[in-house]
């Protein structure tokens, strides 16, 4: 269960995959696709390497992923000011960065709590002991 007012980490991961895919798609639609496509790929790679439910490679923990999220957010924000980017692509990039910032800010990065095994009744057919 996530902390009050925070999103669960699995939801954070799904949102990052969507945001990364959107940034990649925005880059591929622009006249100069290099910068937005690289930023979208960076977001997707950052999401794929975390040790969490939807992590593909599970190389880093949640604490390090939180730091990497802020680094990726900074890179994405600086990339919005890249020279030679047309106005429409820049606006889409900026909106995607805002969504990513909200996702990062409102996520519960605490480690998953281990599930407690429930004791099974000693009597058959589920009758009370």
Task: Label every model-predicted segment.
Residues 1-6, 25-32, 51-61:
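Short juxtamembrane and helix-loop transition motifs at transmembrane-helix boundaries
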Residues 1-11, 111-129:
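Intrinsic N-terminal pre-sequences and regulatory tails
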Residues 18-25, 72-80:
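Hydrophobic, membrane-inserted alpha-helices
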Residues 28-35, 84-89:
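Transmembrane helix interruption/hinge and helix-loop junction motifs
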């Amino acid at each position: 269960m996530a902390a009050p007012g925070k999103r669960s980490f699995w939801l954070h991961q799904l949102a990052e995959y969507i945001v990364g895919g959107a940034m990649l798609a925005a880059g591929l639609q622009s006249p100069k696709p290099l910068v937005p496509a690289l930023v979208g790929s960076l977001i997707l790679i950052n999401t794929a390497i975390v040790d969490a439910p939807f992590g593909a490679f599970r190389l880093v923990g949640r604490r390090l992923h939180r730091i990497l999220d802020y680094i990726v957010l900074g890179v994405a924000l600086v990339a919005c000011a890249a020279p030679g980017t047309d106005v429409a692509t820049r606006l889409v990039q900026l909106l995607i960065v805002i969504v990513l910032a909200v996702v990062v800010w409102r996520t519960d990065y605490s480690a998953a709590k281990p599930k407690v095994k429930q004791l099974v009744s000693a009597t058959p057919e589920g009758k009370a002991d």
